[in-house]
């Protein structure tokens, strides 16, 4: 079989203006950027306001291997499958971060014959939205250190007299806004800024700082959760950057930088229209990770797509304990749009990996033996799929299981897995998806199952409500969302929680950051663990995004590169063609 990039290059694509017309957009509602991508104006929503919304289908998965189990392949393949059975469909996915593209996972455009195209444009820069988020974020960092420098150098009274501004009296030990970069670079996790020659302060005042990956920026979460430009401006204004020496929060509005940050991001609020290999319109927008952020594409993209099509297929990152949980408890609260159907992606290799009989690690290839018939491993790993089915069903959303077939999978094991699912829960539809190898044609049975599931009434139920305390919300996600026995807060987390309550942030949602490779907070614990503790080492306030962010276990907000990163395979030929991107 051809590589992903070769399949993409050998497939004729439509001009993006034709794709936009097919989607139902007027020519003045999008701005083409080249032949194959276009920015979609929010003015389209004004014209479409009276249109009835389509059905929202959220694709999630079992606990994945480090290489993923094909959620994006299934998302794109399902949208193509729906089009094959004459349903009006669009897909909405996140913009890939270049950190994973150059790191372990590679690209995030789907794969095989279920890709967003051109895949190299999607995976590398696209329309620069992540760059805009990075620049806006680091503008705030520059504003903080500049203000700290001038206030400390002159003294507060002299600063006020000279500048006409009110001194913020920043506590340099409590600057909570770290810098960001769209790369995996562990060396930048802890740094010192403002270093000077002896007895000089020209470079600012020395303090500890660090970098997160851009996908973990609160601005990325805001971009995914906002619904218009005015709301974007308000949310950015509420972002807490630091605290003063009286312990009060200082926001982007306090630093008078929120307006400039919003200006920097004004074009990034528009989703990017692209197409699948079969010409299905696809909106790309925002890119928060699901392990260290809320992990879903944007509300704006969903709103536009839901007005233009009968079925919108989107995805939440990693397993249902990660992106799907956050879709239900964070995204739905902001959008007020509940999912009509959930699709759980499972694979034979992923279930065997969850058996505990294989030692799989990020950055190392999967052993060939994982594709051999192994009933014991499949039965043991099936506990993980059972857990995810029960987890999704507790939100009372109609559920379909899609078994994503790899070329090495045996028909005997696929049939055995289908029967195991039916025996476990006859109410859950299950179909084998061959979207990777066959495109939409390989996902038509899955598409029929999704259409049927969407005809059922979704009695959506979140895990918690705004009026509950922050402790109750954290416990709800840990104990009900993960099946944990308890949650334990470090002394620092307890102190932060009390402070957030004092400053009036108790109504916010909670976003738990943990490993995606286990339902627990320990990556090596596979299957369907129970009776474990969720240790919260630190809490971060995302007042603009609307959630409290809990760092659990040893999760990092700046990834590192493996010993053999994906960038080693990337190159370019004499004609400008990129090679080695997958």
UniProtKB/Swiss-Prot annotation:
Q: Which residues bind ATP?
A: 65-72
Q: Which family does it belong to?
A: Belongs to the formate--tetrahydrofolate ligase family.
Q: Which reaction does it catalyse?
A: (6S)-5,6,7,8-tetrahydrofolate + formate + ATP = (6R)-10-formyltetrahydrofolate + ADP + phosphate
Q: Coiled coil: which residue ranges?
A: none
- Which GO terms label this protein's molecular function in UniProt? ATP binding; formate-tetrahydrofolate ligase activity
Record pathway: One-carbon metabolism; tetrahydrofolate interconversion
Question: What does the record give as the organism's lineage?
Answer: Bacteria, Pseudomonadati, Pseudomonadota, Gammaproteobacteria, Vibrionales
- EC number(s) reported in the record: 6.3.4.3
Q: Which CDD domains match?
A: FTHFS
Q: Which organism is it from?
A: Vibrio atlanticus (strain LGP32)
Q: Which UniProt keywords apply?
A: ATP-binding, Ligase, Nucleotide-binding, One-carbon metabolism
Cited SUPFAM superfamilies: P-loop containing nucleoside triphosphate hydrolases
Pfam family, any one? FTHFS
Q: Name one GO biological process term.
A: tetrahydrofolate interconversion
Q: What class of enzyme is it?
A: ligase
Q: What is this protein called?
A: Formate--tetrahydrofolate ligase
């Amino acid at each position: 079989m051809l590589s992903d990039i070769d399949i993409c290059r050998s497939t004729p694509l439509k001009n993006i203006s034709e794709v936009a017309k097919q989607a139902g957009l007027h020519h003045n509602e999008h701005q083409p950027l080249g032949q194959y991508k276009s920015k979609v104006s929010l003015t389209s929503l004004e014209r479409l306001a009276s249109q009835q919304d389509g059905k929202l289908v959220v694709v999630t998965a079992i606990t994945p291997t480090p290489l993923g189990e094909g959620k994006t392949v299934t998302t794109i393949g399902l949208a193509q499958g729906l089009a094959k059975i004459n349903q009006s469909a669009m897909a909405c996915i996140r913009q890939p971060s270049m950190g994973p593209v150059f790191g372990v996972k590679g690209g995030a455009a789907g794969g095989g014959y279920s890709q967003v195209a051109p895949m190299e444009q999607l995976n590398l820069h696209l329309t620069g939205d992540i760059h805009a988020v990075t620049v806006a974020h680091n503008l705030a960092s520059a504003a903080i250190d500049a203000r700290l420098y001038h206030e400390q150098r002159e003294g507060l009274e002299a600063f006020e007299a000279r500048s006409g501004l009110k001194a913020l009296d920043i506590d340099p030990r409590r600057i909570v806004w770290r810098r960001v970069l769209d790369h995996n670079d562990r060396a930048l996790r802890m740094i010192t800024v403002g270093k000077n020659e002896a007895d000089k302060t020209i470079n600012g005042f020395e303090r500890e700082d660090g970098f997160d990956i851009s996908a973990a920026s609160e601005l990325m979460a805001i971009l995914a959760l906002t619904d218009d430009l005015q709301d974007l401006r308000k949310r950015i204004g509420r972002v807490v950057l630091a605290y003063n020496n009286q312990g009060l929060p200082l926001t982007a509005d306090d630093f008078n930088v929120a307006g400039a940050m919003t200006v920097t991001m004004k074009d990034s609020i528009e989703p990017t229209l692209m197409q699948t290999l079969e010409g299905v319109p696809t909106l790309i927008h925002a890119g928060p990770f699901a392990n260290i952020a809320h992990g879903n594409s944007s509300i704006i993209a969903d709103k536009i797509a839901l007005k233009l099509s009968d079925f919108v297929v989107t995805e939440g990152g990693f397993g249902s304990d990660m992106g799907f949980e956050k879709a239900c408890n964070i995204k739905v609260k902001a959008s007020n749009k509940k999912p009509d159907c959930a699709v759980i992606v499972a694979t034979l290799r992923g279930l065997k990996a969850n058996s505990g009989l294989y030692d799989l690690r990020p950055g190392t290839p999967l052993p060939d033996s994982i594709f051999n018939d192994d009933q014991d491993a499949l039965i043991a790993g099936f506990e993980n799929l059972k857990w995810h089915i029960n987890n999704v069903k507790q939100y009372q959303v109609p559920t379909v299981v899609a078994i994503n077939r790899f070329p090495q999978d045996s028909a005997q094991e696929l049939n055995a897995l289908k029967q195991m699912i039916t025996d476990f829960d006859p109410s859950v539809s299950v179909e084998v998806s061959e979207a990777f190898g066959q495109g939409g044609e390989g996902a038509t049975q899955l598409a029929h199952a999704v259409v049927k599931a969407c005809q059922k009434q979704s009695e959506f139920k979140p895990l918690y409500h705004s009026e509950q305390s922050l402790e109750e919300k954290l416990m709800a996600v840990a104990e009900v969302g993960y099946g944990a026995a308890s949650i334990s807060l470090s002394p620092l987390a307890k102190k932060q929680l009390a402070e957030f309550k004092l400053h009036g942030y108790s109504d916010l949602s909670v976003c738990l950051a943990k490993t995606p490779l286990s339902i627990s907070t320990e990556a090596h614990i596979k299957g369907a663990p129970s009776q474990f503790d969720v240790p919260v080492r630190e809490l971060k306030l995302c007042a603009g995004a609307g959630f409290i962010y809990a760092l659990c276990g040893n999760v990092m907000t700046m990834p590192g590169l493996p010993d053999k990163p994906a960038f080693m395979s990337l190159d370019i030929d004499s004609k400008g063609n990129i090679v080695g991107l997958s």
